[in-house]
Amino acid sequence: MPLSHRQTLTRYLIEERRRFPEASGELNALILDVALACKALARVVSFGELGDALSDGSAAPTGGGINVQGEVQKPLDVQSNEMFIRMNEWNGQLAGMASEEMEEPYLIPSSYPRGKYLLVFDPLDGSSNIDVNVSIGSIFSILRAPADVVASGRDVTEADFLQPGAAQVAAGYTIYGPTTQLVLTVGNGVAAFTLDPNLGEFLLTRSDIRVPEQTQEFAINSSNSRFWEPPVKRYVDECLAGKTGPRGKDFNMRWVASMVAEAHRILMRGGVFMYPRDTKDPAKPGRLRLLYEANPVAMLMEQAGGRASTGREPILGVSPTALHQRIGLIFGSKDEVERIERYHQEPASNEAAAPLFAERSLFRD
């Protein structure tokens, strides 16, 4: 099927840059290199079990290690991280990088020029799904390097990356599913690009994506229900009560165990995703990482008319305190996220306004 009439990612970025005559084009070049890393990873993923990258990390010489998160690395975790580094370290646009798979920031080698941006990424989200052929993805966030880093050329430190999500200049993800799609914002709405395997180019297939304000779908890992805080229990119970409950309509519950897949579904047709703060592990008040998971998804949601929150405050307003900081995350259709925020704000005595939920949860503790 000829798709030559569709806009390429390169053309899209050029036309976006024209809105800012003073722009140098460095951001465009960086995004295109990120896209190249995603293309390379898409090719590896497409071979599935025909290749070596999807095998059990415990049996592979390049996998089976433990990353900074305390998670066992599969070969593709390691390979995807290496792809992102090699595709982006040389281009002269970056002052440094940070990844889920690396404990410390990655310093640009002295043999390459340094630039004015920072790249933060999760090279392979949903890697627990690799062996069962469920959609996985890559997430990235682009920040400006502090002025003194650019002026002096000094090595970046962890503190240079600790910027609130509102400071992002671009964010996106690539989902490796039946097709490979790159979803991107440069601060002027959200667009989706599908990888044409014949041309090897990302082509614009959706522009000005908007998240429906209302929904009848929610995504949460119900196995953690005994650890949820009362506002989250209340919200889920009300959804599960369906037409006979206070919401007066039926809801469907989803869970893919891949935040990229969940975010993509919500951007395309609405919904709300919850991986909230809970009491399961006091040392981890949230499961997802702020800088390279919550922040880029929050920027995409907000740019698409949705909302992203901890339940207590907007994600984009949170000031990070550590490179791998975890946080509770709720995002999706604006009306639903705001409802959950209201439940967090109401006094505890009002959290069980409906008698059905005053004494028990539909999820038994």
UniProtKB/Swiss-Prot annotation:
Under the heading Gene3D superfamilies, the entry gives: 3.40.190.80, Fructose-1,6-Bisphosphatase, subunit A, domain 1
Gene Ontology MF, one? magnesium ion binding
Q: Where in the cell is it found?
A: Cytoplasm
Q: Which cofactor does it need?
A: Mg(2+)
Which keywords annotate this record? Carbohydrate metabolism, Cytoplasm, Hydrolase, Magnesium, Metal-binding
PROSITE patterns from the entry? Answer: FBPASE
A biological process term (GO) from this entry: fructose metabolic process
> What's an example GO cellular component term for this entry?
cytosol
- What is the UniProt remark on how the cofactor binds and its stoichiometry? Binds 2 magnesium ions per subunit.
Chief localization class? cytoplasm
For this entry, the protein name equals Fructose-1,6-bisphosphatase class 1 2
**What is the organism of origin for this protein?**
Cupriavidus metallidurans (strain ATCC 43123 / DSM 2839 / NBRC 102507 / CH34)
